[in-house]
A protein has these predicted regions:
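Class I (Rossmann-like) S-adenosyl-L-methionine-dependent methyltransferase catalytic domain
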Residues: 1-48, 61-124, 147-151, 167-226
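Short glycine-dipeptide loop
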Residues: 50, 160-166
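Local beta-strand N-terminus motif with an aromatic residue
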Residues: 51, 132-133
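Conserved class I S-adenosyl-L-methionine
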Residues: 51-61
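A conserved beta-strand element that flanks and buttresses the S-adenosyl-L-methionine
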Residues: 136
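Short catalytic micro-motifs in class I SAM-dependent methyltransferases
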Residues: 139-143
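A short glycine-rich, Lys/Arg-flanked "PGG" loop and its adjoining helix->strand segment in the class I
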Residues: 150-162
C-alpha cells in the first residue's frame, strides 16, 4: 500500500526514517535485499509529474523505478553504465533473476518502448543542456569517487532546466551528508528546502553488508542556467 506524505515534509533533505511512508511493491514486489528501496521509491515517486521530461540516472537493469516513470511522466529517459540497458532481452533476463520468470514474462511491452535508453557515464551524460525537468538518482552517488561525483553533479546541473530538480538518495557513511553544501557551492546547484544532517535515532539502517548503513535523501535545485 502506498501512502502520500505531506508536501512540505517531503521537500526536506535528511536521513530517511523508519516512520516514513514506504511501499513494498513498485511494478514488482520489491526484493527483500533492497532494504532501503521501499522508502526511496515511495519518496521519489512523489516528485513525478505528468508534464515532465525526466531522467533516471544510473537506473540499473531490473530496477523498476524507470518503468514506473513511463506511466507517470510525459517523456522518460534512463541511462546506465551497464550496456545491458540497451537490450530488451538482457533487461528481461535480469528481471527474471531478481523478481522471477513470471515478472519478466508479463512485463508490459510499453515499459520498454516508452523508455529512451542510453549507455552512459554520469560524468559525461549524452543529453543536451536544459533537457530535463527532473533527474532521479537513487542509491548511486555513494559508489562514485570524489572526482567522478563532482563531475556528475555538474552534468546534472547542465542537463536540468532552470528550477529543475535533482531527486537523489545515497548511502551513509559511503557518502557524507555534511558535504552536500560544499558540493552545491562548486556545481551550480542548491538544496531546495531545509537540510538536516543530524542522524535521528530512528534512521533506517542495514548491516546486511557488514558495517551499519543509513540512507539519506536530498532535493536539489538548479537555480539558473548551466
Amino acid at each position: 500500500m502506498m501512502d502520500t506524505p505531506d508536501t512540505t515534509a517531503m521537500m526536506e533533505s535528511r536521513y530517511i526514517r523508519q516512520s516514513d511512508p514506504k511501499t513494498d511493491t513498485l511494478v514488482f514486489p520489491l526484493h527483500p535485499a533492497w532494504w532501503s528501496r521501499p522508502y526511496e521509491y515511495e519518496w521519489a515517486r512523489q516528485f513525478a509529474r505528468s508534464s515532465d521530461v525526466v531522467l533516471d540516472a544510473a537506473c540499473g537493469i531490473s530496477h523498476p523505478f524507470k518503468f514506473w516513470l513511463t506511466e507517470h511522466c510525459r517523456e522518460v529517459h534512463a541511462c546506465d553504465w551497464d550496456e545491458r540497458i540497451l537490450s530488451d532481452e538482457a533487461i528481461r533476463l535480469d528481471i527474471a533473476a531478481d523478481f522471477g520468470e513470471q515478472a519478466a514474462l508479463h512485463l508490459p511491452e510499453h515499459y520498454l518502448t516508452r523508455l529512451h535508453r542510453a549507455q552512459a557515464n554520469l560524468a559525461q551524460l549524452p543529453y543536451r543542456p536544459e533537457q530535463f525537468d527532473r533527474v532521479f538518482c537513487i542509491s548511486v552517488l555513494e559508489h562514485l569517487d570524489t572526482g567522478t561525483m563532482l563531475r556528475a553533479f555538474r552534468e546534472f546541473a547542465r542537463v536540468l532546466k532552470p528550477r529543475g530538480q535533482l531527486i537523489a538518495t545515497f548511502d551513509v557513511p559511503e557518502m557524507r551528508p555534511d558535504l552536500l553544501e560544499t558540493i552545491m557551492a562548486v556545481t551550480g546547484l542548491t538544496i531546495e528546502d531545509k537540510l538536516t544532517v543530524e542522524e535521528p535515532a530512528d534512521a533506517i539502517s542495514s548491516e546486511m553488508y557488514g558495517a551499519p548503513i543509513r540512507c539519506f535523501r536530498a532535493v536539489i535545485c538548479k537555480t539558473g542556467k548551466g
